[in-house]
Amino acid sequence: MTRSASKVARTPRAFVRLVSHDETRADWTLPVIDEVKRLGCHWACSHREARRPRSISDGDIIFMARIVDHPHNILVYGRALAMKHVTGRDSATGADIELRPWKAEWPCYIRLRHPEFVDGTIADGVPLFAMMDELAEKTFTSTKRNAKNGNGNIDPKRAYWHQPSMELTPDATKWLSARLEHAFVQHGRISRRTLALLDWPEGWGPLSR
């Protein structure tokens, strides 16, 4: 058996990511397409320089979410496949910052492939608190590990507080994927034609591999 053939294929991990660059809370009636345009999350998630995203690998799943208020919750409205961060390549350009000035403080990218978004409002997304209530410590890899070890925080709502992203357990990935698929069936996906009209880096697009 060759060395390459003997390697065990890596199972993609899944993360839920608060895509917004600020801590403001959205209204439930915010159209998803407006959030996508504002953040540019059709092709990248942005991170601060001090928190350069080293843990994300090619093919990992990124579920995109936004904090909402009245009532308070976190709603997942889209997903995409990640590309591993490469220093230099995945940094905001002057043109990027001119278009979205906040990227001066959030210049590090995780590029995204095959984005899918609910074609509706943020309210049509999947409420993350429902998953946390049902799965409890089995929501995140960190809380599941803490429960197994008998120490540390096992409350998923506390674990997520002020964290830009959290790794999901396989159970949580399955739970969230099923309900997001249901949201796509109910409300549709934002079309590739619509996404193609948004700003894209040169050589990049909604069908990029």
How would you describe each model-predicted region?
Residues 73-77, 81-170:
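Aromatic- and Lys/Arg-enriched surface recognition patch
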Residues 58-60, 108:
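Short beta-strand or tight-loop elements
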Residues 66-72:
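Short, charged beta-turn/beta-strand-edge "cap" motif at the junction between a beta-strand
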Residues 1-58, 70, 166-209:
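Compositionally biased, charged N-terminal/linker segments
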